[in-house]
Amino acid sequence: MKHKLLKLLLLVELVILGVTLNQQVKAEEAYDITKVVATAWVKSDGSLIMKRQITYDFNDDVHGVYYQQNLAKHQEIKDLHIAVQDNNEEPQAATNYSVKQTAEGDRFKVYHPVSEDSRLTVTYDYRITNAITNYQDTAELNFMIIGNNWNTDLDHVTASVIFPGPVKQLKAWAHGSLNGAIRVLPNQGKIIMTADNLNGKTGIEVHTIFPVSVTAANKNIVRHKHRQAVLRQEAKLANEANQKRLRGRIINWILIVLGLISGLAAIIKGFSVKKQGVTPEKDVGFNS
């Protein structure tokens, strides 16, 4: 029993050490991303007008930043504009940047020197073609609005999908952070997603369906029904997410209990060592 308890305490210590080391690694990045705001405006032709604002706090001197927009095979980026804002100055159009097409999408690199302890906000404006698919009974947008390949966590994230007006039968789901929130506002034609301390490898995916009339000019058409398949899929994913949340809560409680046991065992061990210690002999005086 004693050996089992020692093994259990060792496991708890290893878990705590792993969390501590992970936090130390994250702290060594050259920058923090304190804020990301991504807004997608839905257009009648099935494209999205995107605005991305990314705010960096730098811990070191750097020569620039980059962002990659992943794309499907039939999608393109049009009308790209980039602006940079140093600290609290007015935004300026970026003139020194490059765009590289990769197998995954387009990679934007902005050449802009930044010194240590500075803040930089980069704004990307562009259009993504063929972002929405029109089916016979619904239109669908399934889009990674916040990517999942960042080198650091994102402190505060807001992502929105905005329609031209109110949208009846608007349904939407967000996938990624289990601690995030989504608000679906059919009367305002908006979907708003928020998350704090978003893991850089998690991202946020928005999945929404709405009437085909919203994107009536869309030429990206699939001639079969799809709405019920989406509803079944999202019901399954919601159940899986709830099970994952439950497992997470159980693990947290187990770690808390193990921590209490570890602390209690340390206290008991301290008393036991004190009780079993050797009583020192009294000094004996002598004459020479």
Model region roles, listed by residue range:
Residues 2-4, 21-170, 174-268, 277-288:
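Lumenal/extracellular ectodomains and adaptor appendage modules
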Residues 9-20:
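Bacterial N-terminal signal peptides
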